[in-house]
Regions:
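Catalytic Tyr-X3-Lys loop
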Residues: 82, 89-108, 123, 127, ...
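Conserved glycine-rich Rossmann-like NAD(P)H-binding loop of the short-chain dehydrogenase/reductase
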Residues: 29-45
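C-terminal helical subdomain
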Residues: 165-173, 189-225
């Protein structure tokens, strides 16, 4: 198991299926958590795992940046996001704005919130969750989703290249399939065809503990089939 004792990690999307698994894994590894989420989902997360602080914030709002800057963290794990499909010829500007806001703007605001402290202490890690479609650079029936998740990957990798000399690293996580969640099971997906969220959480914790000269900048995580 990864050892994250003495580390403070900000986890966004608290209460979601993946974030719940990540939160438990990080706590088990000894990390202190700052949970960021909204409403009932955030409350569920607060009830399930101990957290140093709990922030009910809308990360699509630029005002969230200043609130996040009040908190000193060693790593950011960003799981906020949305999925959507539509025929390319039926997509609207609102569809584009909504998808980019959910997947890219929220990440940008979270990063802008935590980055000043990371740069000051000359150490930090930013983990962003992308998608299989972005890894393949193709998503039939989900062009806007694919583009927004590709933006996530490009942003995090660019941050890594720009800031690694200042102690701040980046890692992109690509779930190369659906994650095992109640929603996906209700949709008829079988457990063996989906990714174990706790296993994915363990992979993220592993990435967070890599030494400076052995970075993991991209993780592709697959189900069994």
């Amino acid at each position: 198991m990864a050892n994250l004792s003495g580390t403070t990690i900000m986890l966004t999307g608290a209460g979601g299926a993946l974030a719940t698994a990540v939160a438990q894994e990080l706590v088990d590894a000894g990390a202190e958590l700052i949970l960021v989420g909204r409403g009932e989902s955030l409350k569920r997360a607060e009830d399930r795992v101990p957290a140093t602080e709990v922030l009910d914030l809308d990360l699509s709002d630029p005002a969230s940046i200043e609130e996040l800057r009040r908190h000193k963290v060693d790593a950011l794990v960003h799981t906020v996001g949305a999925y959507g499909m539509q025929d390319a010829h039926k997509a609207t500007p609102d569809d584009l704005n909504g998808m980019m806001t959910a997947n890219m703007t929220t990440l940008f605001h979270a990063v802008q919130g935590v980055l000043p402290h990371m740069l000051k202490q000359k150490e930090g890690m930013i983990v962003g969750v992308s998608a299989a479609q972005a890894a393949r650079m193709s998503g039939k029936g989900a062009a806007l989703y694919t583009a927004s998740k590709a933006a996530v990957a490009a942003y995090v990798l660019s941050l890594h290249d720009e800031l690694k000399g200042k102690g701040v690293r980046g890692c992109v996580v690509y779930p190369m399939g659906a994650i095992d969640t109640p929603t996906n099971r209700e949709a008829g997906m079988t457990w063996e065809a989906t990714i174990d969220p706790r296993g994915m959480a363990q992979s993220i914790a592993h990435a967070l503990t890599r030494p400076p000269r052995a970075h993991l900048t991209e993780l592709k995580i697959y189900p069994d089939v």
